[in-house]
Amino acid sequence: MSKRIAGPEIERLIQLLARVPGLGPRSARRAALHLIKKKEALLVPLGGAMQEAAEKVRICSCCGNVDTSDPCTICTDERRDPATLIVVEDVSDLWALERADTMNVRYHVLGGRLSPLDGIGPDDLNIKGLVERVASGAIKEVILAVNATVEGQTTAHYITDQLSNFDMRVTRLAHGVPVGGELDYLDEGTLAAALRARTTL
């Protein structure tokens, strides 16, 4: 058992920070120390912002985005093209595409990708909601912006099959997305090129 080096509140802060993706125990300790040193300028406001987010964050019942309102800001933005829908695996992919600032459209978040080995099937994803949105008749193009992994390809083919009876185009991202790559790690220029070069399936 390792020695404790600080009080339980600080230890808990370090443990929670270590659970954030990209932060291991060492990075969490450094982050905790930085926050503590900047208590008034950073720790207190961060604590308040996290408390407020915990109370107000919602999952959009329409698209699956994370926001403080339901429907979310993107779904209620009347300046966005309601006839084009970009399908992504996760909210982080949606945010990455928004950073590319190439298309002013709406989104649909699946909440993952098909992965039989991990026990993730169609019923575990928000595919039914996607089919219902397309069935409304307002959508003329669905852009599949899933990751270029084996699971992503499987998900894209399954969705294409599910949407095959509707009178609309199904396209997917093309050039710029490397095989095995994940959208959240791509730069804005690459994402913009991929959106412009999408192809019909």
From Swiss-Prot:
Report keywords, A-Z. DNA damage, DNA recombination, DNA repair, Metal-binding, Zinc, Zinc-finger
Q: Where are the zinc fingers (C4-type)?
A: 60-75
One family name in Pfam for this protein: RecR_HhH
A Gene Ontology biological process in which this protein takes part is: DNA repair
Single Gene Ontology MF annotation:
zinc ion binding
Transmembrane segment boundaries? none
The residue ranges of the Toprim domain are 83-178
Among InterPro entries, the record links this protein to: DNA_Rcmb_RecR, Rcmb_RecR, Rcmb_RecR_Znf, TOPRIM_dom, TOPRIM_RecR
Q: Which Gene3D superfamilies match?
A: 3.40.1360.10, 6.10.250.240, RecR Domain 1
Q: Which domain of life is it from?
A: Bacteria
Q: Which family does it belong to?
A: Belongs to the RecR family.
By its UniProt entry, which NCBIfam families does this protein fall under? recR
Summarizing the function annotation, the protein's role is: May play a role in DNA repair. It seems to be involved in an RecBC-independent recombinational process of DNA repair. It may act with RecF and RecO.
What is this protein's record name?
Answer: Recombination protein RecR
| Biological classification of the source | Bacteria, Pseudomonadati, Pseudomonadota, Alphaproteobacteria, Hyphomicrobiales
Gene for this chain: recR
